[in-house]
Amino acid sequence: MARCERLRGAALRDVLGQAQGVLFDCDGVLWNGERIVPGAPELLQRLAQAGKATLFVSNNSRRARPELALRFARLGFTGLRAEELFSSAVCAARLLRQRLPGPPDAPGAVFVLGGEGLRAELRAAGLRLAGDPGDDPRVRAVLVGYDEHFSFAKLTEACAHLRDPDCLLVATDRDPWHPLTDGSRTPGTGSLAAAVETASGRQALVVGKPSPYMFQCITEDFSVDPARMLMVGDRLETDILFGHRCGMTTVLTLTGVSSLEEAQAYLAAGQHDLVPHYYVESIADLMEGLGGLSPPPQFPDPVDGGYRP
């Protein structure tokens, strides 16, 4: 049972020593806006030197995978492969490839509520989007992502497509809001998805955390044992719940959204799926447990391109 204990000393060395690898959330864990969390790039280098594989899971659907990889590099995180980055955009593209209804020779199009990064990820997966040049195929899925230009007109069009019972409704995530560096908030995809669900009377399939589908995408590309993986995140209702649902050891870092007091309140209320096994002030605190670790076997190379037909 998770007890929200501080991870340090012998416990830290034992947890890292037994771990196959680490899944990191990004926003609030590795960086906040354009400011990296002090020590984060060095930690990833130390984990690599110790033979611990690192993968990255983000509900941010605004960037296509190549663009997200460039962001890592620009902020000083070097030596990463794009195939190690799993965003809700990547997972949405995969789910739609797998589940889009319709005959193979006319799979239909996706109506997207989202930005150009999400659209680019879908096109890279071979999906057709409503409004693209060429024939106007039947819309067979509505995808709700982070859309800074969400409008009544877009909501109306989405609901019109969803009157077809065979049209899928997919959401990248349910994050209701996101913190801004000035302390204010901006609506998240979860708020937009709730509007579409309410107006259409449909329930969305969600691909991002805490949905286990994101971990399924990882296991399709990498040989991972969830019992030997750490999930490190800053949001209890997203990252920590995701870790518990997938059978991982969970670590809350206090550099982002959730506080230690919130975790302790969930513990007192018996909501154990929202309570981390451990917490750290910052992921830089994990470096203390890496001394003297010998490299275990690495993950095999991922499937070509990260997509499966």
From Swiss-Prot:
Residue spans crossing the bilayer: none
Active-site residues annotated for this sequence: 25, 27
Gene3D superfamilies: HAD superfamily/HAD-like (3.40.50.1000)
Intracellular or extracellular location(s): Cytoplasm, Cytosol; Cytoplasm, Cytoskeleton; Cell projection, Ruffle membrane; Cell projection, Lamellipodium membrane
Keyword Transport: no
Main localization (coarse): cytoplasm
Pfam families named among the record's database cross-references: Hydrolase_6, Hydrolase_like
Binding annotation for Mg(2+): 25, 27, 234
Cofactor note: Divalent metal ions. Mg(2+) is the most effective.
GO molecular function, one term: protein serine/threonine phosphatase activity
Catalytic activity: pyridoxal 5'-phosphate + H2O = pyridoxal + phosphate; pyridoxine 5'-phosphate + H2O = pyridoxine + phosphate; pyridoxamine + phosphate = pyridoxamine 5'-phosphate + H2O; O-phospho-L-seryl-[protein] + H2O = L-seryl-[protein] + phosphate
Family of the protein in this entry: Belongs to the HAD-like hydrolase superfamily.
Stated name of the protein: Chronophin
Gene coding for it: Pdxp
